[in-house]
């Protein structure tokens, strides 16, 4: 594994050195059913980027991969924003045991809202796109895409209202989970 890590870091260094104007994105994922992942989580990925040492490397944050890695999406986004750069966001959803690729907000709408709030705090202006698998469940891909867009717009409007909500910010500062949850639900279930 150490040799594999060294080869990977050296290859990424060579790739990023080739043209420093081109951004190179890493997308971490815990594993696949029959394979091991060298960068299974945000911490390992950020460590790799630091070791590569070039500014043109960042991270694609995939919501389902973050859940699969047992991470909190907003916290992972914050760490990436602090130590590197978010170069893309895959919005989808899942149960956290596999890369489900479900429709946006179908399982974890509150975590998606929290992620969207964090992305706004980070002044994220790059692409947000959907990494879902309509073909796995026989859905019409056009209808599913339309539903993803509609849901994203709804959740993003809620995030816009929550980012500067003084009651929510106070509840968070006081670590009052009940009050925070009540405030978010008030907007989510209007």
Where are these predicted regions, by residue range?
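Active-site acidic/histidine proton-transfer and metal-coordination neighborhood
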Residues: 1-58, 68, 178-189
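Alpha-helix capping and helix-coil boundary motifs
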Residues: 3, 20, 72-75, 137-143, ...
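Alpha-helical packing segments of well-folded alpha/beta enzyme cores
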Residues: 4, 8-11, 15, 115, ...
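A structural motif corresponding to the C-terminal end of an alpha-helix
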Residues: 14-24, 51-57, 115-125, 155-162
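Hydrophobic faces of well-ordered beta-strands that scaffold small-molecule active sites
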Residues: 24-26, 57-61, 87-91, 126-131
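Gly/Pro-rich active-site loop or hairpin
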Residues: 35-46, 65-125, 133-147
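C-terminal helical cap(s) of enzyme catalytic domains, especially alpha/beta-barrels
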Residues: 139-162
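Extended, intrinsically disordered, low-complexity segments
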Residues: 156-190
């Amino acid at each position: 594994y150490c040799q594999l890590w060294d080869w990977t870091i050296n290859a990424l260094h060579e790739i990023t050195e080739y043209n420093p104007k081109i951004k190179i994105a890493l997308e971490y994922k815990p594993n696949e059913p029959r394979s091991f992942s060298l960068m299974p989580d945000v911490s390992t990925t950020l460590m790799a980027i630091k070791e590569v040492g070039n500014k043109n490397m960042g991270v694609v944050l995939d919501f389902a991969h973050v859940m699969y890695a047992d991470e909190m999406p907003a916290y992972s986004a914050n760490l990436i924003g602090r130590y590197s750069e978010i170069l893309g966001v895959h919005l989808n959803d899942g149960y956290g045991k596999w890369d489900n690729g479900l429709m946006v907000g179908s399982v974890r709408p509150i975590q998606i809202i929290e992620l969207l709030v964090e992305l706004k705090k980070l002044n994220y202006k790059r692409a947000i796109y959907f990494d879902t698998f309509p073909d796995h469940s026989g859905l019409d891909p056009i209808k599913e895409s339309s539903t993803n867009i509609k849901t994203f717009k709804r959740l993003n409007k809620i995030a816009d209202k929550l980012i500067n909500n003084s009651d929510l910010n106070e509840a968070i500062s006081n670590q009052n989970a009940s009050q925070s949850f009540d405030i978010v639900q008030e907007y989510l279930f209007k």
